[in-house]
Amino acid sequence: MNKTYLPSTTSLEPKWYVVDATEQHLGRLATQIAMILRGKTKPIYTPSMDTGDFVIVVNAEKVAVTGKKRTQKIYRRHSGRPGGMKTETFAKLQSRLPERIIEHAVKGMLPKNTLGRNLFTKLKVYAGPDHPHQAQKPEVLTLKTIAGA
């Protein structure tokens, strides 16, 4: 039986990518971002290590959903107090905090453990077209989430 390949932590140099969420389908965009965060697109991928890259998402306010999700999809949060459940539709949350929609979708696709929480910190989401990470020299990554486009 072969041993699992473990890359040394010194050989891991994460890249920075910029993704434009304008008119991208939410779920398809989130799956591709989650794969980049985990490092599954690299040949040195190891399930128990952080081999992923940083992802900057811009124009989160322009992300698209299909069907009636804009009015029927509900986001819930709880304050921890009795009766503290708050619900909000996709449209209301998009107008109030558009970054949270993409963060919520990607977070659900990452592992639910310490590694997943560390991977989530590599995701940077911004509502508008500007971001403060120019010093990292991020590469523009074009993701095709619409079939045939």
Curated annotation (Swiss-Prot):
Gene3D superfamilies: Ribosomal protein L13. The lineage of its organism: Bacteria, Bacillati, Cyanobacteriota, Cyanophyceae, Gomontiellales. The gene is rplM. This is Large ribosomal subunit protein uL13. It comes from the Bacteria. PROSITE patterns: RIBOSOMAL_L13 (PS00783). It comes from Cyanothece sp. (strain PCC 7425 / ATCC 29141). Keywords: Ribonucleoprotein, Ribosomal protein. InterPro entries: Ribosomal_uL13, Ribosomal_uL13_bac-type, Ribosomal_uL13_CS, Ribosomal_uL13_sf. GO terms for molecular function: mRNA binding; structural constituent of ribosome. This protein is one of the early assembly proteins of the 50S ribosomal subunit, although it is not seen to bind rRNA by itself. It is important during the early stages of 50S assembly. Part of the 50S ribosomal subunit. HAMAP family: Ribosomal_uL13 (MF_01366). The keyword Ribosomal protein applies.
